Amino acid sequence: RGAGQPRGHRQQAALKDQLEKSQADHGCVVLMEVATGEIRAIANYTRTKSGDYREWMNYAISESAEPGSTFKLATYMSLLDQHKIDTSSLVDIQHGRYDLINPRNGSVALRIRDAEDAGGIITAKRAFEESSNVGAARLVYEHYHDDPKQFTDKLYSYHLNERDGLQIPGEGYPRIKNPNSRDWNKLQS
């Protein structure tokens, strides 16, 4: 950073530039020191009604969003910790497309896709390496379909449903649905 330039200034400028190019509603950049995990800079912008961008909310810690691929790690940890699979267990990733069928009406309740076709039958280790959505979903469905609470309880045992206690104000509350949740859906949760 240049003399007199506040920490995070370049990140703010880069974020604002990308938001303007894509006309996104909001965005966030987090610069972390890999060796220590220390957060070096955070930049956040929200588009206002007039179309310009202003700092309004710290999306890095406040916004609730689907965890995406990072949640696959917790999924595989659960499967391995409960001895449902080992790394050589096989899973059919169906060339990157898997439809969960609603048993009540036979319609597709949820379509799961992978970014790339990594093949058919592969090991759980390879499915994890390929970050296969289909592999993770099929393994969870196969091993927890009859007792989904066993899966969610294991996730809770990792404290994933608790706040981290960050030193930055505004941390959001994580939420992992379980079979006792009012909006639980066995096919999609």
Predicted regions and their residues:
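Extracytoplasmic/periplasmic proteins that interact with beta-lactams or build/remodel peptidoglycan
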Residues: 1-28, 48-51
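Beta-lactam-recognizing serine transpeptidase/beta-lactamase-like catalytic domain environment
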Residues: 5, 27-65, 77-189
